[in-house]
Design a protein with these regions (language model features):
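Conserved hydrophobic/amphipathic alpha-helical signal-anchor segments
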Residues: 18, 42-92
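N-terminal single-pass transmembrane signal-anchor helix
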Residues: 17-44
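Short, structured beta-strand/loop micro-motifs enriched in basic residues and often containing a Trp
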Residues: 94-100
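Short, surface-exposed interaction loops/tails
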Residues: 2-7, 50-54, 61, 65-69, ...
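A residue-level signal for beta-strand positions that form part of recognition/binding surfaces
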Residues: 20, 98, 125
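N-terminal leader/signal peptides at the extreme start of proteins
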Residues: 1-21
Length: 151
């Protein structure tokens, strides 16, 4: 009996060695990515929550500056019925030199809720309040209320 010699071509050898990743290699990579996300993910979400709180504080400061300009022009702060909308439309009030907010619109807080304007305020002529991420009074963390009285 004769044995035939099989000669393997170099192109065939190359294809076998370049077959791709094994299942074990893929599982190791997916596990490593999962561990990294488990460690980094909560920190990123925490930074996002903190940045929304900071943005709300900055917007409240902007409203306070606009209300001070309104007061200088009209000699009073808007009443509870007028609210923050008085900063965008004058209602034919003598001395009104607005709009006092850019864009002519009162923006919502970073969580999409309306700001609350109360007059008289607790320790000032007015209070501006963002109810935080939960949209309800009270709370802690990102759900904590942010007020102009805290400035």
């Amino acid at each position: 009996m004769r044995k035939l010699l099989q000669i393997e071509k170099p192109a065939q050898r190359r294809r076998k060695s370049e077959a791709g990743f094994t299942l074990v290699e893929m599982l190791v990579v997916i596990t490593i990515i999962g561990l990294i996300m488990a460690l980094v993910g909560p920190r990123v979400l925490n930074y996002l929550g903190e940045s929304k709180s900071k943005a709300a504080k900055i917007q409240i400061e902007s409203f306070s500056s606009a209300l001070d300009l309104y007061y200088l022009d009209l000699g009073r702060y808007p009443n509870g019925n007028e609210g923050l909308a008085a900063l965008t439309r004058g209602n034919n009030a003598p001395g009104w030199n607005g709009p006092y907010l850019r864009g002519g619109v009162v923006p919502n807080d970073p969580w999409g809720h309306s700001y609350i304007y109360r007059t008289p305020g607790e320790r000032a002529p007015y209070d501006i309040i963002s109810l935080g991420s939960d949209g309800q009074e009270g709370g802690s963390g990102t759900a904590a209320d942010i007020t102009s009285a805290a400035r």
